Every structure is written in C-alpha cells, then in structure tokens.
Amino acid sequence: NGCYAYRIEHEGKALVFSTDCEHYEDRPNKNLIKLCQDADALIYDAQYTEDEYHGLNGQFSRKGWGHSTMREGVKVAEAANVDKLILFHHDPSHDDNFIKQIEAESRQLFPQSIAAYEGLQIDLSQNELPKSLFD
C-alpha cells in the first residue's frame, strides 16, 4: 500500500497528481489527504471498480496490485476539500462505455469529477470542468 503523489502549486492554484495509489483498507491515507488539502484539482488513480478491487461478483481480487478505485478517490477529495476530481489510469479492459458509467457514478458522489481522456485540458482558474468526452 502507498503511493507516489505530487503537489504542484503556481500563482495560488494547486494540482495534486496521485499515481499508482493503492488505498489502505482500514483507514484513510492521512498523508495523501494532507497533501491534497484544499487543492484545486486531484488527479487520482481509479483503475478498478469496487468489485474488481475486492474480488466480488465473479471478479478476482486486485488487492495489492498498487491501484485504487473511483470511490476511494471521492473519499480523498471530500476529506481534503478538493475542488475537482479527475479520474485516470483506466484499466485497459474498460471500454469508453464502461468509463462513462464510472464517471456518471462519480458525479453522483462528487459532482465536480471527470474521467480523464487523451487531450483533456483542465484550466484551474475556471470553476467548472471542461465537457466530458463521455457526455
């Protein structure tokens, strides 16, 4: 468990990039939450669904593989008071329709979220996220 994460600050804006970030099962990662505190955007490794990660509903478990889930990204974003959540590191087995479903679920939990896609540009000075590729 653990992750690499980077916080980039410039002209009063903050972006956190959290790659290959497997969450703890029993508690939030306090170091990650501290790093993300009040960031304008968090780019979070959301490679798996809950079923895939935990090995439920016919899936095999991906625990210990070094990746996380959208729901864990939402938890971090909420705990750290992040403005925007960008889900990335999509599993290669997930097609666009599958990612669209994950993004829709994420938006129900954290409205300012988007699934990353090639060419996505985020302007931290804007309050709203750009249009989703999956809308």
Q: Across the structure, where does each feature detected by a protein language model lie?
A:
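Active-site beta-strand termini and strand-to-loop segments that position acidic
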Residues: 7-11
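Short hydrophobic/aromatic beta-strand or adjacent loop that forms the aromatic wall/cage
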Residues: 1-5, 119
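Cap/insert and terminal regions of metallo-dependent hydrolase folds
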Residues: 12-14, 18, 22-112, 116-118
